[in-house]
Protein backbone atom coordinates (compact mmCIF):
# COMPACT_ATOMS: atom_id res chain seq x y z
CA UNK A 1 0.00 0.00 0.00
CA UNK A 2 1.11 3.54 -0.73
CA UNK A 3 0.29 7.06 0.51
CA UNK A 4 2.46 9.76 -1.00
CA UNK A 5 0.53 12.84 0.15
CA UNK A 6 0.45 13.45 3.90
CA UNK A 7 0.48 16.60 6.01
CA UNK A 8 1.91 16.98 9.50
CA UNK A 9 1.85 19.78 12.03
CA UNK A 10 4.63 21.43 10.02
CA UNK A 11 1.81 22.49 7.66
CA UNK A 12 -0.28 25.48 8.67
CA UNK A 13 -3.41 23.28 8.51
CA UNK A 14 -1.90 19.96 9.58
CA UNK A 15 -3.03 18.25 12.77
CA UNK A 16 -0.98 15.04 12.66
CA UNK A 17 2.16 14.71 14.77
CA UNK A 18 5.05 12.82 13.17
CA UNK A 19 4.87 10.02 15.75
CA UNK A 20 1.15 9.59 15.07
CA UNK A 21 1.74 9.43 11.32
CA UNK A 22 4.39 6.73 11.73
CA UNK A 23 2.15 4.76 14.08
CA UNK A 24 -0.80 4.93 11.68
CA UNK A 25 1.12 3.91 8.55
CA UNK A 26 2.57 0.95 10.43
CA UNK A 27 -0.88 -0.02 11.68
CA UNK A 28 -2.29 0.11 8.14
CA UNK A 29 0.65 -1.69 6.56
CA UNK A 30 1.53 1.21 4.28
CA UNK A 31 4.92 0.37 2.78
CA UNK A 32 5.60 3.63 0.92
CA UNK A 33 4.69 7.06 2.27
CA UNK A 34 5.93 10.63 2.29
CA UNK A 35 5.08 13.66 4.43
CA UNK A 36 4.51 16.56 2.03
CA UNK A 37 3.87 19.80 3.89
CA UNK A 38 2.63 23.03 2.32
CA UNK A 39 5.00 25.61 0.81
CA UNK A 40 2.86 28.07 -1.17
CA UNK A 41 3.03 31.38 -3.02
CA UNK A 42 0.06 33.56 -3.96
CA UNK A 43 0.07 37.01 -5.54
CA UNK A 44 3.85 37.10 -5.42
CA UNK A 45 4.02 36.42 -1.67
CA UNK A 46 4.92 33.38 0.40
CA UNK A 47 1.62 32.65 2.15
CA UNK A 48 2.20 29.19 3.64
CA UNK A 49 5.55 27.74 4.59
CA UNK A 50 7.23 25.86 7.42
CA UNK A 51 10.55 25.70 9.21
CA UNK A 52 12.43 23.74 6.57
CA UNK A 53 15.59 23.34 8.65
CA UNK A 54 13.65 21.89 11.57
CA UNK A 55 11.62 19.72 9.21
CA UNK A 56 14.79 18.31 7.59
CA UNK A 57 16.27 17.53 11.01
CA UNK A 58 13.07 15.80 12.04
CA UNK A 59 12.93 13.69 8.88
CA UNK A 60 16.57 12.71 9.39
CA UNK A 61 15.84 11.78 13.00
CA UNK A 62 13.13 9.36 11.87
CA UNK A 63 15.02 8.34 8.70
CA UNK A 64 12.15 9.52 6.49
CA UNK A 65 12.19 11.11 3.02
CA UNK A 66 11.90 14.90 2.84
CA UNK A 67 8.78 15.96 0.96
CA UNK A 68 6.79 19.10 0.26
CA UNK A 69 3.64 20.09 -1.55
CA UNK A 70 4.64 23.21 -3.42
CA UNK A 71 2.12 25.63 -4.87
CA UNK A 72 2.24 28.84 -6.88
CA UNK A 73 -0.53 30.75 -8.64
CA UNK A 74 1.82 31.99 -11.36
CA UNK A 75 1.83 35.59 -10.12
CA UNK A 76 5.20 37.23 -9.43
CA UNK A 77 8.00 34.82 -8.58
CA UNK A 78 8.27 31.69 -6.47
CA UNK A 79 11.50 30.35 -4.97
CA UNK A 80 11.33 26.96 -3.30
CA UNK A 81 13.99 25.54 -0.96
CA UNK A 82 16.44 22.90 -2.17
CA UNK A 83 17.08 19.56 -0.51
CA UNK A 84 13.72 17.82 -0.83
CA UNK A 85 13.59 14.20 -1.96
CA UNK A 86 10.05 14.50 -3.30
CA UNK A 87 8.07 17.47 -4.60
CA UNK A 88 4.35 17.44 -5.23
CA UNK A 89 3.03 20.32 -7.30
CA UNK A 90 -0.47 21.14 -6.12
CA UNK A 91 -2.25 24.18 -7.56
CA UNK A 92 -4.95 25.41 -5.17
CA UNK A 93 -6.03 28.80 -6.45
CA UNK A 94 -9.19 29.13 -8.56
CA UNK A 95 -11.90 31.76 -9.10
CA UNK A 96 -15.22 30.39 -7.85
CA UNK A 97 -17.04 33.41 -9.33
CA UNK A 98 -16.41 32.25 -12.90
CA UNK A 99 -18.88 30.08 -14.84
CA UNK A 100 -18.03 26.35 -14.53
CA UNK A 101 -16.30 26.01 -17.91
CA UNK A 102 -14.29 29.22 -17.45
CA UNK A 103 -13.37 28.29 -13.88
CA UNK A 104 -11.90 25.00 -15.07
CA UNK A 105 -10.12 26.64 -18.01
CA UNK A 106 -8.59 29.36 -15.85
CA UNK A 107 -7.36 26.74 -13.37
CA UNK A 108 -5.90 24.52 -16.09
CA UNK A 109 -4.15 27.43 -17.81
CA UNK A 110 -2.62 28.41 -14.48
CA UNK A 111 -1.56 24.82 -13.85
CA UNK A 112 0.14 24.50 -17.24
CA UNK A 113 1.92 27.84 -16.81
CA UNK A 114 3.33 26.81 -13.43
CA UNK A 115 4.26 23.27 -14.51
CA UNK A 116 6.49 24.68 -17.21
CA UNK A 117 8.39 26.84 -14.72
CA UNK A 118 9.03 24.86 -11.53
CA UNK A 119 10.79 21.63 -10.62
CA UNK A 120 8.54 18.85 -9.35
CA UNK A 121 8.08 15.07 -9.46
CA UNK A 122 4.31 14.65 -9.37
CA UNK A 123 1.28 16.75 -10.30
CA UNK A 124 -1.19 16.61 -7.43
CA UNK A 125 -4.99 16.59 -7.62
CA UNK A 126 -5.55 17.80 -11.19
CA UNK A 127 -9.20 19.03 -11.33
CA UNK A 128 -8.88 20.13 -7.67
CA UNK A 129 -11.64 22.80 -7.92
CA UNK A 130 -14.20 20.06 -8.65
CA UNK A 131 -13.80 19.05 -5.02
CA UNK A 132 -15.34 22.30 -3.80
CA UNK A 133 -16.96 24.19 -6.69
CA UNK A 134 -18.91 23.76 -9.92
CA UNK A 135 -16.21 23.27 -12.52
CA UNK A 136 -16.64 21.86 -16.02
CA UNK A 137 -13.41 20.07 -16.82
CA UNK A 138 -14.92 17.99 -19.63
CA UNK A 139 -15.41 21.21 -21.60
CA UNK A 140 -11.63 21.72 -21.45
CA UNK A 141 -10.22 18.44 -22.71
CA UNK A 142 -7.77 20.28 -24.96
CA UNK A 143 -5.98 21.87 -22.00
CA UNK A 144 -6.11 18.67 -19.97
CA UNK A 145 -4.45 16.88 -22.88
CA UNK A 146 -1.66 19.49 -22.98
CA UNK A 147 -1.04 19.01 -19.26
CA UNK A 148 -1.00 15.22 -19.52
CA UNK A 149 1.28 15.25 -22.56
CA UNK A 150 3.67 17.51 -20.63
CA UNK A 151 3.75 14.96 -17.79
CA UNK A 152 4.43 12.09 -20.17
CA UNK A 153 7.15 13.89 -22.14
CA UNK A 154 8.90 15.14 -19.00
CA UNK A 155 8.58 11.87 -17.07
CA UNK A 156 6.43 13.29 -14.29
CA UNK A 157 3.87 11.28 -12.34
CA UNK A 158 0.14 11.94 -12.07
CA UNK A 159 -1.26 11.77 -8.56
CA UNK A 160 -4.67 10.25 -7.90
CA UNK A 161 -5.81 12.04 -4.74
CA UNK A 162 -8.40 10.17 -2.70
CA UNK A 163 -9.63 13.14 -0.65
CA UNK A 164 -12.14 13.99 -3.37
CA UNK A 165 -13.98 10.74 -2.67
CA UNK A 166 -15.11 12.22 0.63
CA UNK A 167 -16.03 15.63 -0.80
CA UNK A 168 -17.79 14.90 -4.08
CA UNK A 169 -17.60 11.13 -4.50
CA UNK A 170 -14.71 11.06 -6.99
CA UNK A 171 -10.93 11.16 -6.71
CA UNK A 172 -8.92 14.06 -8.10
CA UNK A 173 -8.49 13.74 -10.97
CA UNK A 174 -11.63 11.88 -11.99
CA UNK A 175 -11.11 8.47 -13.58
CA UNK A 176 -11.84 9.69 -17.11
CA UNK A 177 -8.77 11.93 -16.83
CA UNK A 178 -6.70 9.00 -15.55
CA UNK A 179 -7.83 6.97 -18.58
CA UNK A 180 -6.94 9.88 -20.86
CA UNK A 181 -3.46 10.00 -19.29
CA UNK A 182 -3.01 6.28 -19.93
CA UNK A 183 -4.18 6.59 -23.54
CA UNK A 184 -1.62 9.37 -24.08
CA UNK A 185 1.17 7.08 -22.92
CA UNK A 186 1.25 7.88 -19.21
CA UNK A 187 2.42 4.91 -17.18
CA UNK A 188 3.53 6.38 -13.84
CA UNK A 189 1.04 7.46 -11.19
CA UNK A 190 1.00 7.75 -7.45
CA UNK A 191 -1.76 7.79 -4.85
CA UNK A 192 -2.21 10.12 -1.89
CA UNK A 193 -4.85 10.54 0.78
CA UNK A 194 -4.04 14.23 1.34
CA UNK A 195 -4.51 13.45 5.03
CA UNK A 196 -4.20 16.37 7.44
CA UNK A 197 -5.16 14.20 10.43
CA UNK A 198 -3.68 10.82 11.29
CA UNK A 199 -7.05 9.05 11.16
CA UNK A 200 -7.38 10.01 7.48
CA UNK A 201 -4.11 8.38 6.41
CA UNK A 202 -4.72 5.74 3.76
CA UNK A 203 -8.36 6.71 3.40
CA UNK A 204 -9.82 5.64 0.05
CA UNK A 205 -6.56 4.24 -1.28
CA UNK A 206 -7.62 0.60 -1.56
CA UNK A 207 -10.77 1.68 -3.42
CA UNK A 208 -8.73 3.69 -5.93
CA UNK A 209 -6.20 0.89 -6.34
CA UNK A 210 -9.01 -1.49 -7.30
CA UNK A 211 -10.16 0.94 -9.99
CA UNK A 212 -6.64 1.34 -11.33
CA UNK A 213 -6.09 -2.39 -11.84
CA UNK A 214 -7.49 -2.07 -15.38
CA UNK A 215 -4.38 -0.05 -16.29
CA UNK A 216 -0.80 -1.26 -16.42
CA UNK A 217 0.53 1.51 -14.17
CA UNK A 218 3.71 1.72 -12.16
CA UNK A 219 3.53 3.71 -8.95
CA UNK A 220 5.97 6.42 -7.93
CA UNK A 221 7.01 5.76 -4.34
CA UNK A 222 9.92 6.09 -1.96
CA UNK A 223 12.27 3.33 -0.89
CA UNK A 224 14.07 4.83 2.05
CA UNK A 225 14.79 8.29 0.65
CA UNK A 226 15.09 7.22 -2.98
CA UNK A 227 12.31 7.69 -5.53
CA UNK A 228 11.39 4.41 -7.19
CA UNK A 229 8.59 2.99 -9.30
CA UNK A 230 6.84 -0.10 -7.97
CA UNK A 231 4.09 -2.46 -9.04
CA UNK A 232 1.30 -2.76 -6.49
CA UNK A 233 -0.86 -5.83 -5.97
UniProtKB/Swiss-Prot annotation:
Ranges that cross the membrane: none
Catalysed reactions listed for this entry: L-histidinol phosphate + H2O = L-histidinol + phosphate
GO biological process: L-histidine biosynthetic process
Pathway of action: Amino-acid biosynthesis; L-histidine biosynthesis; L-histidine from 5-phospho-alpha-D-ribose 1-diphosphate: step 8/9
Keywords: Amino-acid biosynthesis, Histidine biosynthesis, Hydrolase
Gene Ontology molecular-function annotations: histidinol-phosphatase activity
Endpoints of the signal sequence: none
Pfam families referenced in this protein's UniProt entry, alphabetically: PHP
Domain of life: Bacteria
This protein's name: Probable histidinol-phosphatase
Organism in which the protein naturally occurs: Thermotoga maritima (strain ATCC 43589 / DSM 3109 / JCM 10099 / NBRC 100826 / MSB8)
Encoding gene per record: hisK
